Amino acid sequence: ENISEVDRLLNETDDRYVSLNYDCGHFYFANEDPLKAIKKYMPRISHIHLKDVRDNIKTRVEKENLSFLQGVKLGVFTVPGDGDIENMGEILSYIKKQNYNGWVVVEAEQDSAVANPFEYAKMGYEFINKHMNIW
């Protein structure tokens, strides 16, 4: 999911029928700026996935030429605020400023034996609320 692939998809499809499920973690994993991406694609976004990325695992995936799935299993993704996407707070603020009212899903995609789901859900909630002040 890099910018050129998304550009091609959106340029070659009718916006009445095709929208974008924006995922900040996937853009970052593809070495794209997720803030730049959301600003560019907001008119076509109908669904948002929020997750953060652990750079140490992302670097390992790249150096060892591991698959996306292997990266997920190693714990490359985490809840917003627990990873290394430096402009995550700006992304959240931008979503709020745009008065986006579609679905937002918080993802962690982690091993529940390693990362307690309740604790990580709470951590993600607190970070999101800090930047969006919606609850």
Which residues fall in each region the model found?
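Histidine-acidic metal/acid-base catalytic patches
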Residues: I3-S19, H26-W135
